[in-house]
Regions:
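S/T-rich, low-complexity, solvent-exposed segments of bacterial secretion/appendage proteins
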Residues: 1-255
Length: 255
């Protein structure tokens, strides 16, 4: 009773967070060139004016579409503590890529072919055309290590999908709610003994049913679903909401 079949050996644990939590995890995800996907970004959104300036009566703007390759992390709303490595070489934030807190801070029209951007809100790296081409043409491997504080109810627990560390009780967040770092960029632990290190591994539970015959009786979450499912739903909701907002603006303009 009360056992789960998606959580490996931890059959008494839940796959998802059961309530909103302020837990802090350091998570590492591995990607290949095949994980890059296309996403469209838009600029020059329409703002409905409160009044018309007689000198410039034409308030129309041309919405511009920008298409880039990106990788999406398992979670959005991460901290700015994110490290990207390509083929084992760690890139430097501020030099090799720019970190933006929200989508509204990111201007896709200014992302050059040789630039890379990271958006904390959506948890995605956006690659300029030359960078993306280099990754794909050379089948490069990418690794991202990032910190996330705060998970919603129903979010998948990272330990069932990734190599990660639960550092909730091992660090003291600063006034801004961020994990403190030293000059070298390493996390400052207030109590290192309280770091819970999860090394992701296959955890099949097998029963012996006959001589030299075993059967696997559990299914692990990673084999049937990934954290991208919830991210896909979130993006779909955003698209629908943007469409609703667009229709509302048209209605206001027609009034």
């Amino acid at each position: 009773a009360g056992r789960t079949v998606f959580t490996g050996y931890r059959t008494s644990s839940k796959l998802t967070f059961q309530k909103d939590t302020k837990s802090t995890y350091q998570i590492t995800q591995e990607f290949s060139a095949a994980d890059l996907s296309e996403k469209r970004y838009y600029t020059n959104g329409v703002t409905v004016p409160n009044s018309i300036n007689a000198a410039t009566p034409d308030c129309t703007t041309d919405v511009t579409e920008h298409s880039f390759q990106r990788i999406r992390l398992g979670y959005g709303n991460t901290t700015d503590d994110v490290k990207l490595s390509i083929d084992g070489k760690e890139l430097t934030p501020g030099t090799d890529y720019t970190v933006y807190k929200s989508v509204s801070d990111f201007d896709p029209s200014k992302l050059s072919a040789d630039d890379t951007a990271y958006i904390q809100e959506t948890g995605e790296f956006v690659f300029g055309k030359n960078v993306a081409a280099s990754i794909k043409d050379n089948d490069k491997k990418l690794s991202v290590t990032y910190v996330k504080t705060g998970f919603d109810s129903s979010d998948a627990r990272p330990e069932y999908y990734y190599n990660c560390k639960d550092i909730t009780n091992a660090v003291t967040l600063d006034a801004g709610g961020n994990v403190p770092h030293d000059a070298a960029g390493d996390i400052i632990y207030s109590d290192p003994s309280k770091v819970v290190d999860f090394k992701f591994s296959s955890q099949e539970i097998k029963y012996t049913v006959a001589n030299s015959t075993d059967i696997t009786v559990n299914t692990q979450a990673k084999d049937v679903m990934d954290t991208g499912i919830k991210r896909d739903v979130d993006e779909l909701i955003d698209v629908v909401q943007n469409a609703v907002n667009a229709h509302d603006k048209v209605s206001q303009i027609k009034k």
